[in-house]
Amino acid sequence: MIKRGLALLVLLCMALPCAGMAEQTEARRVVYLTFDDGPKKDTPELLETLSELDVPATFFLVGLSVRAFPEYAKQIVQAGYAVGSHTMAHSIGRIQKDAEFVLRDLARFEKTMREEVDETFSTDLFRFPGGSTAYKSRVKTLVRDAGYAWFDWNTMTGDAQYTFSSDQEMLDYTLRQTEGK
């Protein structure tokens, strides 16, 4: 199911910029595929589909998941996908309470990636667990000053919140999320 669902989503992404170009003469709409919280057990299938369709993507990995599935994290890096930190443990509450914790967590993530995946690994990409709006400016300043650029999202497939009965249902949900964006 993931392969068909992803293929439908990729086709949607390919169509969105064209539709946007018809209505917008100065700006081009762009869709970036990003995947959070991995690697997971379905990562190999996802990578295969992305490769077959020649689609770029960015993966925001969690250090504990990297430890659980180091081979999948290696596959992501070796395939040339952009990789960012989604922290070591996805500890939303801890980061909100202790601004400096985010820096320690980012360092732990990068150390884990170097130990488990590639000894030369380094990234300046970051995604806050739960999105950046949940965090105070002090945390954001620390992240920026440490050399990271953070990225949020404006559309979600809903796969983390809902169980869809079909690929079409997930695609329809995602399309509704893109309206006006």
Predicted regions and their residues:
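Sec-dependent N-terminal signal peptides of Gram-positive bacterial secreted proteins and lipoproteins
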Residues: 2-22
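Active-site beta->alpha N-cap acidic-glycine motif
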Residues: 23-97, 101-123
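Generic "edge-of-domain/loop-turn" microfeature
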Residues: 15-16, 40, 66, 133
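Polar/charged alpha-helical tracts
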Residues: 3, 23-25, 48, 168, ...
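Catalytic domains of cell-wall/extracellular-matrix polysaccharide-remodeling enzymes
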Residues: 90-181
